[in-house]
Every structure is written in C-alpha cells, then in structure tokens.
Amino acid sequence: MKVAVVSIGSFDTQYSDYHIMRDIILGLLERGHEVNLIQKQYLETPQYPQQFEKYLKGQLQVQNIRFEKKAKADLKARYLADLSYYKQACTLMKKDKPDKIFLQSNNTAFFTVFYAKHILRCPILYNEQDIFPENAFFAGILSESSPVYKVAHALQKYAYKNATALSTISDDMKSTIVTRYSIP
C-alpha cells in the first residue's frame, strides 16, 4: 500500500514530534508499505534519521518543500505560510496518488482533509496532537467570542468530522474533541 505521510515539521530539526513521526514511518516501512514522506525543508541539505537510510530511494520517497519559519508572534504570517505548505503537499499527493494519507496535527488541517476527501478521494487519518484553537483558548490568548477563535474552531471541526479516521495522543485530548466539537 502507498501511504503519504504529511508532516508538520522536518527531520532537519529535532521538533517536538520527531520521535513519534520517525517511529510511525519506520513501522509502516517495516510492514512493507511504500511511504511518501512530505515534509518542510528548513536547511540547505535535508537530513533524515539514520534508520531511514536503508529505505531511501526504495520503499521511502521523501519530498521536501522549502519552508521559511515566520516569527512566532506573527500568527497570520505563520498560518498563511502553513496553508501554502499544505497546498503544495496536496499538489504532490495528486501526482503520487497514495492509497491512504496520514496527516499530522496542524492548524490548517481543514484544507488537506477537504482536498483528500473531495479531490483525491483518498482515505485520510488525521493525527491530532495539539488542538487549535482550544490550546490558545486554554492559554488565555483567544476568547471563545473572538472572530478568530470562531472561524478556527469551525475549520478544525470540519477536519475532525470529515477525516476518515481521527487519532489523538491521549484520552483527555479525545475527550476535549468529543466535548468541545461534538464529534462522536
């Protein structure tokens, strides 16, 4: 089976989910699946975990999308940059025609879920690890009455309801999604 794995980060850097993504990809490869990893590229020369070496150019194809990090305080620029990245990822998946898609947690998931469902007509597993905008609400950055919160909440709800499957990293996160988004 051909599985597209769309990462929020890059193996160029040790981001917070590095080990989880590495292990998911290795698990798929060890079970005989072909994996097309789509990831951001921050450095001039892409880097990968050593465990990937025996699979590169065989079962594992990697497509790097150049990405420039935006200032952490510039939420709008970061959101638009991520949306551009996922648009490019969807274009790559349209060419590759995966059998299934694994989408890592991100703030613009609605776009990739919509594209997978309606354009590619491909099953998509959305792996939620950081519930946006709930994380901003719980941190006191956004209020539930703000337009930004309402729009972001509606877009994430679309992603949750329309993904073929949804996975979370903890039971309390699952409970939050079920409760705050009315997802069965």
Predicted stretch roles:
Residues 1-50, 54:
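N-terminal subdomain of nucleotide-sugar transferases
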Residues 8, 12, 67-76, 96, ...:
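Acceptor-binding helix/loop patch of EC 2.4 sugar-transfer enzymes
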Residues 90, 110-119, 132, 146-166:
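Membrane-proximal helix-turn-helix segments that form the acceptor-binding/catalytic region
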Residues 37-96:
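A conserved catalytic-core segment of Leloir-type glycosyltransferases
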Residues 45, 78-88, 98-134:
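An aromatic- and histidine-rich active-site surface loop
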